[in-house]
C-alpha cells in the first residue's frame, strides 16, 4: 500500500473532548468546537475522514461535531464553518495580534534572580504567590505543599551546613536563620529556573505576523491597514457615545479624528447599509479568548478638501517626449515618393 492510499483510507481517531452543545446560544468569545474541512474533490465523494458517513445532502465544506461515533453509528455534527471564514478574513487583513496594554510579553520576559538577602527572603514565597484572585482554600493547599517541601530539606540542610559552614553550628538562632533562608533560596531557585514558562500569548490562529514588519506593494511600503466595514450602533458608556463597527467578522471600537459626522445621526439604522473605510489601529487577544479591536474611521473628503486637491498644479515630467512631425510633412514625403516611382 502506498503512502497516498494509506492517507486516503485513514480516519480521525480522536480530537479534544467538548461537552458544550453544537447549537450553543450563550455568549461565546471564541470557537468552542473543532472544525473539519474537506476539499472539493473529496466533498463530491462525501469523504470527510470520519468513521461514519455524512448525508449526501450536506454541501458545506466545513463541519463541527461532538462525537465521532455513537451507538447508532452516527456522527453528531452541524454543517457550520462561520468561525473559519472569520479567521480567513482576519488573515487577509494582515493585522498582527499584540499583547494587552500593561501585560508583559512572556516571550521577552526577564526573570530576575535574587542578589541580596531581602530578595532571597521574598523568593521563598515565589511558589505561594500565584494569581491575585486565588481562593483561600487554594492558598491554604499551596501553603501546605510548600511547608512539606521545606521539611523535606532538613537532612540536606544539615549536610550543607556541615560542609560549607561548620563553625556556624555554635552560633545563635538568628544567624542560623539567615543560613536557612540562603539554603532554601538556593534550592527553590534551581527548581524554578528549570521549569518551563507555560504563560504564552495565543493568537487563536488568526495571525502569525509580527508587529512592525514592513509590507510591500507595487505602490510602495504599506504603512497603514485600511479595510472596509460597516457602522453597527451606538452604545452608552460613561455618559459618552461609543460607536461600534463590523470589520472582517469582528466588532471593533471606532475612533474619530474629531467627532462623529453629523450625517451619522440623521441616517439612523440605515447607516448599516453603507460601507466605510477604517484604519485598524490595534488588535489584541483578551484572557477570555475574545479579540479586542480598535479602528479609526477614514472620513470622506468634504467639498473644500476636494476643491483644494483639484486646484493643485499638474507638474510636467522632466523627460521631454519627442515632438511629432506635422501631418502635412508626411503627405509631402508620400507624394515625392510616388513621383519618383512614376518617373522610373
From Swiss-Prot:
It is found in: Mitochondrion. Changing residue 241 to H: Suppresses defects in the 5'UTLs of COX2 and COX3 mitochondrial mRNAs. Present with 656 molecules/cell in log phase SD medium. This is Small ribosomal subunit protein bS1m. Changing residue 235 to A: Suppresses defects in the 5'UTLs of COX2 and COX3 mitochondrial mRNAs. One of its GO terms (biological process) is mitochondrial translation. GO terms for cellular component: mitochondrial inner membrane; mitochondrial small ribosomal subunit; mitochondrion. Component of the mitochondrial small ribosomal subunit (mt-SSU). Mature yeast 74S mitochondrial ribosomes consist of a small (37S) and a large (54S) subunit. The 37S small subunit contains a 15S ribosomal RNA (15S mt-rRNA) and 34 different proteins. The 54S large subunit contains a 21S rRNA (21S mt-rRNA) and 46 different proteins. Keywords: Mitochondrion, Phosphoprotein, Ribonucleoprotein, Ribosomal protein. The modification Phosphoserine is found at residue 327. Component of the mitochondrial ribosome (mitoribosome), a dedicated translation machinery responsible for the synthesis of mitochondrial genome-encoded proteins, including at least some of the essential transmembrane subunits of the mitochondrial respiratory chain. The mitoribosomes are attached to the mitochondrial inner membrane and translation products are cotranslationally integrated into the membrane. bS1m functionally interacts with the 5'-UTR of mitochondrial mRNAs. GO terms for molecular function: structural constituent of ribosome. Belongs to the bacterial ribosomal protein bS1 family. It comes from the Eukaryota. It comes from Saccharomyces cerevisiae (strain ATCC 204508 / S288c) (Baker's yeast). Pfam families: Mit_ribos_Mrp51.
Amino acid at each position: 500500500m502506498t503512502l497516498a492510499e494509506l492517507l486516503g483510507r485513514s480516519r480521525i481517531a480522536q480530537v479534544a473532548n467538548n461537552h458544550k452543545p453544537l447549537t450553543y446560544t450563550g455568549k461565546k468569545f471564541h470557537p468552542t468546537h473543532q472544525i473539519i474541512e474537506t476539499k472539493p474533490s473529496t466533498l463530491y465523494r462525501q469523504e470527510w475522514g470520519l468513521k461514519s458517513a455524512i448525508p449526501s445532502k450536506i454541501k458545506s465544506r466545513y463541519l463541527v461535531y461532538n462525537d465521532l461515533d455513537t451507538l447508532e453509528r452516527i456522527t453528531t455534527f452541524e454543517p457550520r464553518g462561520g468561525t473559519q471564514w472569520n479567521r480567513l478574513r482576519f488573515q487577509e487583513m494582515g493585522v498582527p495580534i499584540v499583547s494587552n496594554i500593561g501585560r508583559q510579553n512572556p516571550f521577552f520576559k526577564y526573570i530576575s534572580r535574587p542578589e541580596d538577602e531581602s530578595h532571597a527572603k521574598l523568593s521563598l514565597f515565589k511558589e505561594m504567590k500565584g494569581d491575585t484572585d486565588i481562593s483561600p482554600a487554594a492558598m491554604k493547599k499551596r501553603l501546605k505543599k510548600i511547608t512539606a517541601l521545606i521539611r523535606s530539606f532538613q537532612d540536606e540542610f544539615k549536610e550543607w551546613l556541615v560542609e560549607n559552614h561548620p563553625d556556624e553550628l555554635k552560633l545563635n538562632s538568628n544567624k542560623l536563620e539567615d543560613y536557612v533562608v540562603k539554603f532554601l533560596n538556593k534550592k527553590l531557585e534551581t527548581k524554578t529556573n528549570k521549569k518551563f514558562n507555560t504563560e504564552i500569548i495565543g493568537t487563536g490562529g488568526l495571525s502569525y505576523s509580527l508587529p512592525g514588519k514592513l509590507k510591500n506593494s507595487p505602490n510602495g511600503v504599506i504603512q497603514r491597514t485600511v479595510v472596509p466595514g460597516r457602522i453597527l450602533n451606538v452604545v452608552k458608556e460613561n455618559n459618552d457615545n461609543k460607536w461600534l463597527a463590523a470589520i472582517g467578522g469582528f466588532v471593533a471600537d471606532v475612533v474619530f479624528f474629531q467627532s462623529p459626522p453629523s450625517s451619522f445621526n440623521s441616517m439612523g439604522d440605515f447607516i448599516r447599509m453603507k460601507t466605510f473605510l477604517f484604519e485598524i489601529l490595534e488588535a489584541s487577544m483578551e484572557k477570555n479568548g475574545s479579540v479586542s479591536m480598535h479602528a479609526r474611521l477614514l472620513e470622506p473628503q468634504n467639498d473644500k478638501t476636494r476643491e483644494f486637491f483639484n486646484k493643485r498644479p499638474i507638474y510636467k515630467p522632466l523627460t521631454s517626449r519627442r515632438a511629432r512631425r506635422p501631418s502635412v510633412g508626411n503627405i509631402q514625403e508620400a507624394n515625392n515618393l510616388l513621383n519618383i516611382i512614376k518617373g522610373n
